[in-house]
Amino acid sequence: RCKMLNNRFAGDALKKVDTLNAAGIRMNGQIVLCKGVNDGKELEYSIQKLMEYLPNVESVSVVPVGLSKYREGLYPLEPFNAQDAGEVIDLIEKYQKICMEKYDTHFIQASDEWYILAGREVPEEERYDGYLQLENGVGMIRLLLDEFHDALKRRIIEKASGAKLPWEGTREISLATGRLAFPYLKRMSEELMQEYPGLRI
């Protein structure tokens, strides 16, 4: 950590957690995973170590390091692939089961990117423990899907009772999104267009 961040104090993170834990302060943590650096056995060790801080550490998210082409002079890192993502998910879900049995919380959470990269469906709402890590990209896709389908069901019921559309005739709209979220937006758009033939997205 000190070498990667070029900061000799960067290795003191757990000391700060110790101080906050001793004071009974509630925390939520994040592990930024770097391929070949802190994944695999190192990730498993980190999870086990952070479990010692329960219940004051309420949740920990695991997110892949963000990489761009502008990395000149930075620590050399490689992007994760689908197999890597599957292994990360499997390890996290293993410890989710352990934490549920021991502490009645899933505790460790995989960000949405892992499931998308691995080609797996995101977990059900219950696995997110109230979306404690939403700001870290954990559960955003599940929350979006659930809220969309709830709203669509309400609209179908309203339409069946004679409610009119908020527009007349046909309507065309455009959505801008990134590559990761595209499959989900596409799926929801198709469901919406199927329900409303005059709508084109």
Language-model features and meaning:
Residues 38-52:
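Catalytic cores of alpha/beta
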Residues 13, 43, 85-88:
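Aromatic/hydrophobic pocket-lining residues that form the small-molecule binding cavity
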Residues 3-5, 39-41, 73-79:
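Short, solvent-exposed loop/turn segments at secondary-structure boundaries
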Residues 14, 44-47, 189-190:
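Short amphipathic alpha-helical segment that frequently serves as the phosphate-/nucleotide-binding helix
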Residues 51-53, 61, 66-201:
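Auxiliary Fe-S-binding modules of radical SAM enzymes
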Residues 1-20, 26-38, 57-65:
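Core AdoMet radical
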